[in-house]
Design a protein with these regions (language model features):
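Conserved beta-strand-loop-beta-strand hairpin that lines the nucleotide-binding pocket
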Residues: 4-8, 14-72, 76-110, 136-141, ...
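Small/flexible residues
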Residues: 44, 160-161
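N-terminal assembly/transducer modules of large multi-domain enzymes
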Residues: 107-159, 165-174
Length: 174
């Protein structure tokens, strides 16, 4: 298990870039009243067939050709975190179309890792592949944040006293 959820997002995002994605959509939704956190990552990379997807989730196999040994723990670790924290994990992939990953979990679960530095995660993904269209959509108890690497701008949510002076995505899941 990664000690921050943003590292799970970074791992999946970097795998998407390695799979040839030209578009990467990341969504984080937190609803503390319903005690629910949802993370979605979708790409238009090479995708996987059902057998490969099953192998990756069951046997810790990697799709990266340069690996000498199969490891591929990224999806397995996020699935473990999601299920351990009372949530659901799902991956949908279509060859030559792309992959979508959804992980949900209880916000209040004692084992839920903190979000971590989501700003640094998005920056790293943009720096790793500046031509890829990377989009981040966050919602935390009704406050919304949107970033698009291709638009070159972001929309910052209305500030509350708690988030005043913090980073741009501060109100998007602590």
């Amino acid at each position: 298990m990664f000690d921050q959820l943003s590292l799970n997002i970074l791992d999946i995002g970097m795998t998407s870039l390695a799979a040839g994605a030209t578009a990467l959509r990341i969504t984080v939704i937190e609803n503390t009243k319903r005690d629910w956190l949802v993370i979605r990552v979708r790409d238009n990379g090479c995708g996987m067939d059902k057998k490969t997807l099953r192998d990756i989730l069951a046997k810790n196999t990697s799709t990266k050709a340069h690996r000498q040994k199969p490891i591929g723990l990224g999806l397995a670790l996020l699935r473990q975190t999601s299920e351990m924290c009372g949530g659901v994990f799902h991956v949908h992939s279509i060859p030559r179309k792309g992959t979508g990953v959804t992980a949900s979990m209880r916000v209040s679960h004692v084992d839920r890792p903190p979000m971590g530095d989501l700003n640094a995660t998005i920056f790293a993904l943009c720096a790793a592949s500046p031509t890829v269209d990377i989009e981040l959509n966050c919602e935390s108890d009704g406050e919304k944040f949107h970033f698009s690497s291709q638009e070159g701008k972001y929309h910052e949510p209305r500030r509350t006293q708690e988030t005043q002076g913090q980073g741009a995505a501060a109100s998007c899941v602590a």
